[in-house]
A protein has these predicted regions:
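Metal- or metallocofactor-binding catalytic centers and their adjacent structured scaffolds
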Residues: 237-270, 276
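A conserved hydrophobic secondary-structure block that centers on an alpha-helix together
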Residues: 282-286
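Intrinsically disordered, low-complexity regulatory segments
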Residues: 1-166, 170, 448-449
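Active-site phosphate-binding and catalytic loops of NTP-dependent enzymes
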Residues: 23-28, 148-153, 174-178, 205-210, ...
Length: 722
């Protein structure tokens, strides 16, 4: 008899149906020479400290560090688990062979290996390795069963991870609880959770300690187009006023007009982290909710394996893509075949689907490829599932569209003042981006407006970046036709602005920070290079964030993640950089990947951790300070904090924003750019912005803002003023 063991009953049921083992028994199904049984995720776990010796049952500093000579596993103490395990054990001990049908990943390998070890299975074991749960994929997987030994390094990496987490977590948690917890709370320390908490705490301190500084921006309006001085911002008002007086009343001359064509490739396919990031940005789904939704879509056969960290497909997927697209075209979301026109447009070209190296690259795929639709048309999706499927389907469709072609126009100008003994010149610049052929952007045409509005409302809510330093974004707009050498009158302005603090983390930005070990990069290629040293795995990051919530170390305020007093004091108490450093934790992750790739010895990894925990214990025990960590309760989290002003602190005698504009062509008059009194209700939506006079008023999440926020307009009217 061949025993198949799946990771959950629903998967076992699908497998049993396909291989003809449909008659149900108690805890398994049987037929056609197969017995198909299942686990419920983890049935086994590493032993607790007191399972090794009674001396480790009581929490005591003198017992630390606790390092067993040999790590063992035990059955999780649950009646349902024990009953199912007894069934599995009986089947395995009588089996001729076993097929490991666990989740095709590191954790899935560990789950099933531990069960087989505990059941003392002695027969040969094959491995079912598939990336989707469609009938076709399962049939093909059974035709191409692998020898389990091919996945030994995957198991060793998972085992090393589990043992490493035990060594650090068990010892450091007891150490810090006993030393700093005042016998009133458990201070949980984890290899991934503590550096993640440190990211949030450090960002919060940056914000709390941020001192807003004024700066001045010189610009001028020529032919209804705003040019900005290339000299950058002025840090003193005097410098700005001097530059302003230099150009006031003098003609503006266009010195150069250049056009450059460019291509913008479609965005990469989704891995788990990028999907969680987009779901948080677009729908405010937590990482944990997104993981559950995509897992559900996978189990319903609508999308491929979700716990992946690659955004590429293998070459063997390419021949299947037309069939997948055909299935996606039949999908009905909210009773509409919304993907059919997009896929018909692809077919109308009469060409084969393009095979780009940015999509298909065997060298960028290890266990599983990027998340894509399976081609099975979804039915009965919840609204939340439909949102996630929509992202995946559109991303898959878009990679077969041509690049977006655009033209960037850059116009340079100058104002020269020859009144003094030496001519003074100030140069200006403006850029505009014109879409020539939208290419893949047509897939997102209906989403574009909503996306822009989301960004605009973030600005209206006061989330306009950090430290005044932003990546230059060329606005999509068609500039007037300028000619080199033309000259005329212009309207200069000197605007006072304030540097702004960094933003609080959201789950989206925190996931990105975890992925790149705290390094903040926007470039997709560079981010991919940093992934190997990220903290945590794609599949575990959502759980880590949820753990921080459960421990009352962090809390949510709208979409922002903020540390509680307990979380802040815990990080302040930890002086051992190893425990809270993203970089060092990232190196651990790299070593675990190397174990998986057979280039690093698991024994060296564990021995290194043993040395490190010994050092940490010695350092903490030698601390003679009276430090302790505050307690944050559930009641504390429910308390409503007093509202804080969104504007950063400013020195007295300074205005929010001030502009200088020429009057009668030869003098300048100072004007205040404060928000005029307006009704704080929806009646102002669509009206001309009272600050810049160019944009219109839009509604954000907590305030009204200006549609010209990208152009620098700072108008903001909170709802609270109603």
């Amino acid at each position: 008899m061949i025993v198949c063991i799946a990771e959950k009953p629903s998967v076992a049921k699908d497998i049993a149906r396909i291989i003809g083992a449909t008659p149900a028994r108690d805890g398994y199904m049987e037929g056609n020479g197969y017995q198909v049984t299942w686990t419920f995720g983890h049935l086994c776990e590493l032993k607790e400290p007191d399972d090794y010796t009674p001396m480790w049952k009581r929490w005591s500093l003198s017992a630390l560090p606790m390092i067993p000579q040999r790590f063992g596993i035990k059955l999780i103490n649950d009646e349902g688990i024990r009953k199912q395990f007894n069934t599995i054990e009986r089947l395995m001990q009588a089996a001729d062979s076993i097929i490991n049908c666990g989740d095709a990943g590191q954790e899935g390998e560990l789950i099933q290996r531990w069960v087989m070890q505990k059941a003392q299975a002695k027969c040969p074991v094959k491995r079912l390795w598939i990336s989707s749960m469609t009938d076709e994929a399962i049939k093909q997987g059974f035709q191409e069963l692998k020898d389990q030994n091919e996945y030994q390094s995957l198991y060793l990496a998972g085992l090393s991870r589990a043992i490493g987490d035990w060594i650090l977590g068990m010892n450091a948690t007891r150490l810090y609880t006993l030393k700093y917890g005042q016998n009133r709370q458990v201070l949980s320390i984890g290899r991934v959770q503590t550096p993640t908490l440190a990211l949030i705490v450090n960002r919060q301190k940056e914000i709390d300690n941020f001192v807003s500084e004024p700066y001045w921006v010189l610009a001028t309006i020529y032919r209804d187009t705003q040019f900005t001085a290339t000299s950058g911002k002025f840090t003193s008002k005097e410098e700005g006023e001097k530059a302003f007086s230099t150009i006031a009343g003098k003609p503006f001359t266009v010195t150069d007009v250049s056009k450059k064509k460019g291509n913008e490739a479609p965005p990469h396919l989704y891995d788990l982290t990028s999907l969680q990031v987009d779901c948080n940005k677009k729908f405010a789904y937590s990482a944990d909710i997104t993981l559950k939704l995509i897992q559900s879509l996978y189990e319903k056969k609508y999308t491929t394996y979700p716990r992946v960290d690659t955004q590429f497909l293998t070459d063997d997927i390419y021949p299947k893509c037309p069939q997948i697209l055909n299935g996606v075209s039949q999908a009905k979301i909210m009773s509409q075949q919304k993907y059919l026109p997009l896929i018909q447009q692809l077919a109308a070209t009469g060409k084969k689907l393009p095979k780009s190296k940015k999509v298909f690259d065997n060298s960028k795929v290890t266990d599983h490829h990027a998340i894509i639709p399976t081609g099975v048309p979804p039915t009965g999706l919840t609204d939340m599932e439909a949102n996630v499927y929509d992202l995946i389907a559109k991303r898959f469709i878009s990679v077969f569209y041509p690049d977006c072609k655009f033209s960037t126009t850059t116009v340079l100008g100058e104002v020269i003042n020859e009144d003094g003994p030496k001519p003074e010149k100030i140069e200006f610049k403006v850029s505009g981006k014109e879409i020539l052929e939208p290419g893949w952007r047509v897939v997102y045409a209906k989403d574009a407006k909503n996306s822009d509005d989301d960004d605009a409302t973030d600005n209206a809510n006061g989330n306009d970046g950090g430290n005044g330093a932003k990546k230059e974004v060329v606005e999509e707009r068609t500039l007037p036709s300028f000619v080199k050498g033309e000259s005329g009158e212009h309207t200069p302005t000197l605007t006072e602005k304030w540097t702004t603090p960094p933003k609080y983390y959201t789950e989206a930005t925190l996931l990105r920070a975890m992925e790149t070990a705290g390094k903040f990069v926007e470039d997709e290629e560079l981010r991919a290079a940093l992934k190997e040293n990220g903290i945590g795995r794609p599949s575990s990051r959502a759980g880590i964030i949820e753990t921080l919530f459960k421990r009352h170390y962090i809390k949510r305020q709208r979409k922002n993640l903020m540390a509680t007093p307990t979380g802040i004091e815990l990080i302040d108490t930890i002086h051992e950089e190893l425990l809270k450093s993203c970089e060092l934790t990232g190196i651990w992750e790299k070593k675990l990947r190397d174990i998986e790739h057979k280039t690093y010895d698991p024994a060296d990894f564990i021995n290194g951790l043993k040395e490190q925990i010994n050092q940490i214990v010695n350092d903490v025990l030698s601390d003679n300070s009276a430090r302790h960590v505050a307690i944050t309760t559930e009641e504390d989290l429910k308390k409503k904090e007093p509202s804080k002003k969104t504007a950063p602190k400013k020195s007295p005698k300074q205005d929010d924003t001030a502009e200088k504009t020429p009057k009668n062509g030869d003098t300048a008059e100072k004007t205040e750019s404060r928000s005029p009194k307006l009704p704080a209700d929806d009646s102002i939506i669509g009206k001309t912005c009272p600050i810049c006079g160019q944009g219109t008023i839009i509604k954000g999440k907590t305030a009204y803002g200006c549609s010209n926020w990208k152009g620098g307009c700072q108008f903001r009217l909170p709802f609270s003023q109603q």
